[in-house]
């Protein structure tokens, strides 16, 4: 429920797509309920690289319900029912970062991470990559700040300052780094 100018508006809760270990859809559930019950659901993570082989990082907004203020990959979220992974990636890149670039899927993986607020991420994550030299036009409801960082410097900083980054980013990065370095 949201109070807009004294009028209460009931907003439909965002739903996530529940999946099995093979990414077959099992149904949908409210996002908060899925995170409270640690139910496996579909998600995605986008990585945008520039021509200098730097990764576009976002600092999550301080108002986020988990991992506020932490640095992470360019964009991450959940697919909607009936939406392809690439459609979801494009939608959220525009909503969060104001960028539209071609994306391609690199790999998927499953992870589970609990947070100190009682919520748990249990996601089958589709990792995508795109390329752009454009600075984002961030949505400050979602993103506090952004920066470009070389992959090698980032790899060292994740070891030196792990608490500055989201749990899932630390899990994904090594695999992303290996995949990208084999292709660059």
Protein language model features and the residues they cover:
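A structural signal for short, well-ordered beta-strand segments
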Residues: 46, 75, 105, 126-128
């Amino acid at each position: 429920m949201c109070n807009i100018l004294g009028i209460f508006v009931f907003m439909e809760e965002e739903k996530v797509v529940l999946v099995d270990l093979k990414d077959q859809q099992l149904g949908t559930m409210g996002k908060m309920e899925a995170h409270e019950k640690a139910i496996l659901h579909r998600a995605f993570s986008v990585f945008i690289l520039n021509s200098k082989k730097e990764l576009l990082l976002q600092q999550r907004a301080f108002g986020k319900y988990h991992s506020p203020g932490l640095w992470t990959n360019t964009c991450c979220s959940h697919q909607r029912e009936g939406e392809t992974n690439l459609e979801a990636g494009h939608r959220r890149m525009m909503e969060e970062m104001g960028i539209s670039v071609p994306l391609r899927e690199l790999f998927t993986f499953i992870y589970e991470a609990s947070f100190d607020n009682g919520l748990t991420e249990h996601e089958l994550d589709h990792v995508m990559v795109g390329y752009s030299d454009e600075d984002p036009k961030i949505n400050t409801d979602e993103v506090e700040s952004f920066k470009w960082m070389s992959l090698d410097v980032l790899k060292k900083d994740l070891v030196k300052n792990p608490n500055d980054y989201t749990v899932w980013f630390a899990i994904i990065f090594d695999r992303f780094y290996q995949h990208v370095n084999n292709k660059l």
